[in-house]
Amino acid sequence: MEADGAGEQMRPLLTRGPDEEAVVDLGKTSSTVNTKFEKEELESHRAVYVGVHVPFSKESRRRHKHRGHKHHHRRRKDKDSDKEDGRESPSYDTPSQRVQFILGTEDDDEEHIPHDLFTEMDELCYRDGEEYEWKETARWLKFEEDVEDGGDRWSKPYVATLSLHSLFELRSCILNGTVMLDMRASTLDEIADMVLDNMIASGQLDDSIRENVREALLKRHHHQNEKRFTSRIPLVRSFADIGILASPQSAPGNLDNSKSGEMKGNGSGGSRENSTVDFSKVDMNFMRKIPTGAEASNVLVGEVDFLERPIIAFVRLAPAVLLSGLTEVPVPTRFLFLLLGPAGKAPQYHEIGRSIATLMTDEIFHDVAYKAKDRNDLLSGIDEFLDQVTVLPPGEWDPSIRIEPPKSVPSQEKRKIPVFPNGSAAMSVGPPKEDDHHAGPELQRTGRLFGGLILDIKRKAPFFLSDFKDALSLQCLASILFLYCACMSPVITFGGLLGEATEGRISAIESLFGASLTGIAYSLFAGQPLTILGSTGPVLVFEKILFKFCRDYHLSYLSLRTSIGLWTSFLCIVLVATDASSLVCYITRFTEEAFAALICIIFIYEALEKLFHLGEIYAFNMHNNLDELTSYTCVCAEPSNPSNETLELWKRKNITAYSVSWGNLTVSECKTFHGMFVGSACGPHGPYVPDVLFWCVVLFFTTFFLSSFLKQFKTKGYFPTKVRSTISDFAVFLTIVIMVAIDYLVGIPSPKLHVPEKFEPTDPSRGWIISPLGDNPWWTLLIAAVPALLCTILIFMDQQITAVIINRKEHKLKFIPMPVLYGVFLYMGVSSLKGIQFFDRIKLFGMPAKHQPDLIYLRYVPLWKVHVFTVVQLTCLVLLWVIKASAAAVVFPMMVLALVFVRKLMDLCFTKRELSWLDDLMPESKKKKEDDKKKKEKEEAERMLQDDEDTVHLPFERGSLLQIPVKTLKYSIDPSVVNISDEMAKTAQWKALSMNTENAKVTRPNTSPEKPVSVTINFEDEPSKKYMDAETSL
């Protein structure tokens, strides 16, 4: 929009009569007192620009609080627009720094403590022949929600996009309108009367139309959540008759769900029956989303036919007041913004209302609005907001497009921290720092025996009880059920494999008992209770090698295994005593992702492998002839060439080949007697059973896809949020229940998980307690330390961070089909791949550059180096898989440790900055860190000492002494340093909006108790006999 058009459009917002006072915004206004000082009074002083050094940092704020707000008043430096020397505002007096000063003040009163805000915008709507009413059109909690045109529904929350012109118009409204801060009122009647009195006194409103405006303000409010059929009856009574519930902390933003329905305030409140709040019209689902202690900000905009120019008011109540019916939810109102204007400009007023509502949701302006002392503070907040906004080109973006809210909102803390004198920001966005990776005290070596364990106990003790109480939630129950089903199957499956490898020495019941003990003990007493210790593939390989060694050298396997277990316990205690966990800081993302990717691939591979294994057990005929199906048979027959094992079995059972009726045996009996299956319908392990295999395939993939669908159900548009969240949390458990029920109803005999029925050792000839020596020689007790060292590394490196609670006596898992559990394995593996950056980088190989996603590391690292990093990581992953799948699996932990050294070698190929984006930085030497820290502290001390020396002391009121740093208070000669308040006043758009105030010469008197005073001091420079002016704002 051009300047002339903008001024013409907004002229009604700024029009004043000839006898009215005008506020001229020239960046800053000041009351200047020119004082001539005698020569001897300023002897030996050079010409300096004197100003108040504003404290911004946290330390300065503490010092400000210590001095007390009663006698330490804020002083602002105001400069005249008619600068004789043409200099701009000093860099320390930008809107950003003024806002930082405002936020740095710490008032002792509780009335100005910022609360969460719920903002609602109502527009005055009317039709010919019908009365006015305020209708809710939008609301803001975190993001904007609009009432859809033509529909009785709310839009999805979206990021509000504002036009720069509407923000300029809003600033003009605050500049020229009525601003009343800390108004004490209890009803909307009182608020309206005080606002109208102020408007009439300032000439903004004519007294003849006062009653019309007042009547419009007190019209009823229609909220979106009210039923359509009730819109024809009065929704609320007149605000003059409505009681209030006022308290600085009243209506905490959440309703008490008890039957009494009490509203808890600060000693005041009423029951649901006695309160004027109509609870039947409160949207309880939305009310739950409002934080406790929240307050309301009401924006009222509209057009009427009795006004010739707009009237504007910004009101802050102190304390906040609950005005029933004004807001759709019963929270106390803190802020009111009113904009009423002549008919024909409703869209313009609507955009101004959206602008102030969006500003109230901004973290910085929100705090400024609470702590503002006068109109200038609010203008500084708007200017700081304008200084931070991002402008989208009009030809490249459609403002009607609604932007989805981001997953995480960026922090605004950097807007609260000032820029250093050298121009560098206090907080800058950059690559992750070195200290961010494994920087917690948990991984720092203490240098004392069991020092880390003692610190862990101290850290965990305060939360030990809450760990149990926090588990009493629906999400924890979902995790328990999921992990129970996911972890019990591997334990029992591993036990079966272990039984085969050790010829029944250790089998399923021992694995189940061991997993239960370690899981419960570790969860109760470990520093991380969400870790489960379970057996893995390398452990199985270790057991196979150890059993083979014992069998070859005629040693007792269980006794030697007991000795190794005792040595392993001792070595683990040594690791704890020496704080060996601190070495984990050398395992960066490079190693973590390779190991995590390997686990995901193992889950996927084993799930598919077990499915193929079912195809071998339940084979099907791949050469069927449909015409000969009736002739297919499969019977049990005597083995033609019985083995020695078969003969030994017959002898032990006291049977002969002739005494058995082979043709009448069942499949299981035939396998028991080592019979042979004969016939065209027989496979390697018995008769063909095609329906079982194909049913297992259906169960397997249905479990996977159903788990994925239910897990993503939270983002679907069906059912209420709570229902969707519950379904998503219990996705895997619900999938297992559904698939078990389907399998039961179909009736196909799919293989089921086998759970031991009795709690007894696999070998009935031994007990639970094994002697570490047994029949072995004495030296085995010592030599067992060598394999124990390798076993310790295996256990230490194979921990998986997850959560599990194992209930050993539960046997309901026997009804779960094995393909369903295999499908769960597949889901666990595939779902875990999504959060690994390594796989995102693999996908970049097949993408052209223009189609690649906007990944943060692609902005700072060349693409070819990203590919090199990925290839190295992929090579290490392949080596891990090859070693794990081969006979050398016992050295698998060593390979994981070797990844650390591979990562260290990459420092030679990549710069530190590139690795900071692709990976975590390796820890440097401790000495280097200490040297850097000492050097930084020394420089800081020297800088502070220099600041103390270069200080001007001026006598102040009441005998106080004003200390002013001189060197830090200089004019900015850097053209990149911009004061947006000054620059905005130069724009054609702002001049067009302010053109009607340029002719006004009378400045509105400053009624603020903290009236800024500016002293112009003339310094005489003796050598050059020249006079220089400097300005002090006190």
From Swiss-Prot:
Keywords: Cell membrane, Cell projection, Disulfide bond, Glycoprotein, Ion transport, Membrane, Phosphoprotein, Sodium, Sodium transport, Symport, Transmembrane, Transmembrane helix, Transport. The modification Phosphoserine is found at residues 57, 60, 89, 155, 238, 250, 268, 271, 275, 424, 960, 1033. GO terms for biological process: auditory receptor cell development; camera-type eye photoreceptor cell differentiation; cochlear nucleus development; locomotory exploration behavior; regulation of intracellular pH; retina vasculature morphogenesis in camera-type eye; retinal cell programmed cell death; sensory perception of sound. The chain crosses the membrane at residues 477-497, 506-526, 564-584, 594-614, 686-706, 730-750, 777-797, 813-833, 877-897. Activity is inhibited by 4,4'-di-isothiocyanatostilbene-2,2'-disulfonic acid (DIDS - an inhibitor of several anion channels and transporters). The modification Phosphothreonine is found at residue 951. Residues 250-260 have a biased composition (Polar residues). Expressed in the spiral ligament throughout the cochlea and in photoreceptors of the outer plexiform layer of the retina (at protein level). InterPro entries: Band3_cytoplasmic_dom (IPR013769), HCO3_transpt-like_TM_dom (IPR011531), HCO3_transpt_euk (IPR003020), Na/HCO3_transpt (IPR003024), PTrfase/Anion_transptr (IPR016152). Residues 78-90 have a biased composition (Basic and acidic residues). Residues 1-476, 527-563, 615-685, 751-776, 834-876 are extracellular. Residues 498-505, 585-593, 707-729, 798-812, 898-1034 are cytoplasmic. Residues 1-31, 53-99, 250-276, 926-946 are annotated as: Disordered. Glycans are attached at residues 176, 274, 644, 654, 664. The keyword Ribonucleoprotein does not apply. A motif (PDZ-binding) lies at residues 1031-1034. Induction: Repressed in the brain by chronic continuous hypoxia (at protein level). It catalyses: hydrogencarbonate(in) + Na(+)(in) = hydrogencarbonate(out) + Na(+)(out). The PDZ-binding motif mediates interaction with the CFTR, NHERF1/EBP50 complex and probably with USH1C. Belongs to the anion exchanger (TC 2.A.31) family. Forms a complex with ATP6V1B1 and NHERF1/EBP50. Interacts in a pH dependent-manner with CA2/carbonic anhydrase 2. Interacts with CFTR through NHERF1/EBP50. Interacts with USH1C. This is Sodium bicarbonate cotransporter 3. It comes from Mus musculus.
